[in-house]
């Protein structure tokens, strides 16, 4: 469905973007993929991987910046919203900043998508949004509800929104695996409860789930 289309990924220099971009280029050959993120160094490093590929465009910006989002969303067909404050302790210590990015940023993405006539938006979320026990989960729950409700907000523009909730993503920055690796030689393994389990998903499966959401969605789904 992405053939000859323009795709934008917010937070596109993160772990998901690094997996999504090459796989999508290979499978669908879109006209353009726009990487929208606020870290110029990460963009510079990522750009070296695609030097000479006219299908890749980099756009410095923050989802908190409504005007910049509107500029970036021009002529975009599909948006993957991956930008977020997601490290739990960081969110707890910086609650106002977490809300600005995860909730206000979501509202800006929704408005820009409607007004720029984007066809479909898939927002990345987390299983921590289900019965949240921390600020990160609470802000993502609010964000999810905004995206679901926005399917009745677009009016005649027809923009459609869906949400994908991941568990612990193997290979992503901030995942628990690097922490486990760092303490494996200490002989101690701190866990919340001996019966605790973690649901894990690979980045490859995460990308495939986003593809499925775009192809399957009618608007309002949480995958």
Regions found by a protein language model. Give the residues of each.
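Conserved residues in the N-terminal Rossmann fold of short-chain dehydrogenase/reductase
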Residues: 37, 59-60, 100
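Conserved Rossmann-fold cofactor-binding substructure of NAD(P)-dependent oxidoreductases
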Residues: 51, 57-78
């Amino acid at each position: 469905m992405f053939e000859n289309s323009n795709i934008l990924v917010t937070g596109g220099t993160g772990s998901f973007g690094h997996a999504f971009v090459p796989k999508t280029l290979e499978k669908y050959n879109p006209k353009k993929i726009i990487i929208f993120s606020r870290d110029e160094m990460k963009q510079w490093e990522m750009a070296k991987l695609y030097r000479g590929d006219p299908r890749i465009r980099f756009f410095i910006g923050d989802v908190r910046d409504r005007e910049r989002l509107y500029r970036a969303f021009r002529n975009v067909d599909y948006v993957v919203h991956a930008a977020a404050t997601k490290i739990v302790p960081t969110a707890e210590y910086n609650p106002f900043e977490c809300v600005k990015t995860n909730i206000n940023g979501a509202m800006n993405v929704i408005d820009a998508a409607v007004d720029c006539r984007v066809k479909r938006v898939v927002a990345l979320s987390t299983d921590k949004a289900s019965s949240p026990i921390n600020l990160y989960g609470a802000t993502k729950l609010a964000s999810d509800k905004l995206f679901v409700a926005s399917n009745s907000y677009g009016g005649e523009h027809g923009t459609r929104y869906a949400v994908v909730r991941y568990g612990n993503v193997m290979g992503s920055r901030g995942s628990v695996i690097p922490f486990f690796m760092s303490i494996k030689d200490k002989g101690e393994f701190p866990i919340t409860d001996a019966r605790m389990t973690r649901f894990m998903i690979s980045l490859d499966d995460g990308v495939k789930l986003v593809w499925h959401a775009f192809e399957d969605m009618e608007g309002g789904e949480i995958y």
